[in-house]
Each structure stands twice: as C-alpha cells, then as structure tokens.
A protein has these predicted regions:
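Flexible hinge/capping segments at coil-to-helix
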Residues: 126, 137-153, 233
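A ligand-binding cleft/hinge motif common to bilobed small-molecule-binding domains
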Residues: 111-120, 164-166, 183-217
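Short loop->beta-strand "edge-of-pocket" segments that line small-molecule binding or catalytic clefts
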Residues: 48-52, 145-163
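Periplasmic-binding protein-like
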Residues: 54, 129-139, 198, 202-240, ...
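Ligand-binding clefts/hinges and TM-proximal coupling segments of bilobed small-molecule sensing domains
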Residues: 21-33, 162-178, 240-283
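Short helix-initiation/N-cap motifs at beta->coil->alpha
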Residues: 35, 87-98, 140, 170-186, ...
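Extracytoplasmic small-molecule ligand-binding "clamshell" domains
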Residues: 27-111
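C-terminal motif of bacterial Sec signal peptides marking the signal peptidase cleavage site
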Residues: 13-18
Length: 283
C-alpha cells in the first residue's frame, strides 16, 4: 500500500504561491488539504472524475470500467498519485468542456487544441500529445497533399490551428467538412490532426494510412476549470513523471503503435505556454 504523507503546511504554501510541490516517490501519496486544494478535495471524495472523448480510437474508447486507451492511462496515473479510484465518463468535446465548467468532472481530455484563446477559457496541462495535421489516404493513389487534386476529401480541422484543404491543394475535388470524421461520406482521403485521424485506422490494415509530410504542430493537454490552474499544474507533474519513467512510451507502444506501426518516439517536451504561443490571440 502507498504511504501517505501529511502535508497540511505544504498545502497552505501551495495555495499562497500557486506552486506544485515536488513529485514524491512512486510509493508515496501526498495528503493534501481538502479545503485549500482540488487534490485534497478529490482525496476526501475518494474518486477522480475524468472525462474522455467518445470513440477516439487508441486515445479513448468506452467509459466506466470499460474505458480503454492512451488518455485513460493518463487519468489512471493522476488518480494513482492521489491514492483514489477513478471514474471515467465519455462525451463529445463540447460535453466534456461543459462538465468541467459545471464541476461534474475534475479533469477531462477533450480533443481541443491548446491555443492562447483556449487557455483564457479553461486551465490546461502541458501537452501529453503533439498532433500534426496529416492526410489519411483511403486510395493507394494518394501519397501526399499534391495527390488530393481531383479527389474527394473530408476534413475535420480546428478554425484556429487547422489549414484547410483548399489552401493545401486548391485543385482538390469535392471537400466535405465534418466535426466527427466518423460521419464523413465515402472519400478518397481525410485531412485533420492525427489525434483524430487515428480513430479511423485499424491495426494491420494497409489502408487507410497516414501519408505525406506533417503539416503543422498542435499541442493537446488535459483540461480543468479555469480557476483550477493549481490542479492542472499538479497533473502536469504527473505527466512529466510518466514521461521520464517510461510509462508514456509504454502506453504509446500499447495503443498507438498497433495502429500506426511506429515505434514510440521521444515523449513531448513542450510546455503549455509554448504550445499556446504557437496560436496567439488575434491582435
């Protein structure tokens, strides 16, 4: 059983300075003040309520005890650090954001990119994933962006971070816009961030396949309520520990590699402020 360390004084300092205490050894669970911190409140309630995206392929599927995926492991990592159970609830990006804002969820993993605009509405952790806009080919003749000429394409891109097909290949054929790529009609290719595209792929299949160059870079982090930045910072420390101790790479191997065939790359080292600065507020 993990050992608990009573840190009432540390919690007072935490509230006053908005600093996260040092990450303890793996066999230690810090006991936080339930009045001063969300970490302590979660410990008092005995459960961390985590929102995960619906049908997100290797990133999240199912809910409750049936939840599986990369973000599910991240949620378990945070719950384990607090010594509590975890309750996974699935929803659309909009539903997850609303549940965070209402206090129904403590933490959520909506597929919402980190931008300077986004961090004015919610607190985010450092990125657990750096996505790239890519082309997902269903047609062996589509091997790069230039090959989209005359092809039918479905795109799912963010208004701020995405680059539309019309700019990438002005000669593309019919282009359909879909918030959910699963709702796309039959097409030759899809365009969007890889964090969304991977849900359309299956282990072992030659097609569809990610092709061509990476178009951009976008950070994705876990979300908390805007006023709960201290908790978001605490969660970032748990993600950092998972990266340095090899668990991030292990989860990549368990969930992402079977779909893409890629070996685990270096974990993301980008901080929240760096990710947001890639997409500044309009002046």
């Amino acid at each position: 059983m993990p050992r608990k360390l009573s840190l009432g004084v540390a919690a007072l300092v935490l509230a006053a300075t908005a600093c996260v205490p040092p990450v303890p050894d793996n066999d230690e669970v810090i006991e936080f003040d339930p009045v001063l911190t969300s970490m302590g409140r979660v410990q008092e309630e005995g459960v961390l309520r985590v929102g995960i995206p619906e049908d997100a392929g290797p990133f999240a599927t199912g809910s409750g005890d049936e939840a599986r995926g990369f973000t599910v492991e991240l949620g378990k990592e945070v719950a384990g650090s607090l010594g509590v159970d975890v309750d996974f609830r699935s929803g659309t990006d909009e539903e997850l954001g609303a549940m965070v804002d209402s206090g129904t969820l403590d933490l959520a993993f909506p597929l919402q990119p980190i931008t300077e605009k986004a961090i004015t509405k919610n607190a985010f952790t450092d990125p657990y994933w750096i996505a790239r806009e890519r082309v997902l080919s269903f047609d062996g003749g589509v091997e790069e962006v230039a090959d989209l000429a005359g092809k039918t394409v479905c795109q799912s891109i963010d208004d701020i971070t995405g680059i539309p097909v019309e700019r990438l290949q002005p000669d593309a054929g019919k282009v359909t816009e879909a918030a959910d790529l699963a709702a796309c009609p039959e097409v030759d290719a899809m365009v969007g961030p890889d964090i969304r595209l991977l849900a359309q792929m299956a282990p072992g299949d030659a097609l569809p396949a990610l092709v061509g160059e990476e178009i951009n870079a976008v950070g994705y982090g876990a979300m908390t309520a805007l006023e709960d930045k201290i908790f978001a910072d605490y969660v970032s420390t748990q993600f950092s520990e998972a990266r340095t101790e090899g668990r991030w790479s292990a989860w990549f191997g368990d969930f992402i590699s079977p779909v893409t065939g890629e070996t685990p790359p270096d974990p993301p080292g980008m901080h929240l402020e760096e990710a947001a600065a890639l997409y500044p507020l309009d002046e």
